[in-house]
């Protein structure tokens, strides 16, 4: 499969893949979704051929996002999202908890 992307579109695709993999795997240890790691590595490995070598680092033969990439604002975007949804999730969970307690009182 071939996809024609501009440099800017490719950079956005890297961000999308990184964020998706972060959400799926950042809290996992031994039970990672390795197929997503593989896709991320395939995409980031294309950086070297496309003038974006500073975005990658190679460790034990595997390509990973570099510290420069990770420090470039991507984690701030993830944190902004987490901040935006945290209170919604908390409110919903507390409401479910409280409704459960109220329902138990009437049963």
Predicted regions located by residue number:
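Positively charged, low-complexity terminal tracts
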Residues: 1-4, 15-107
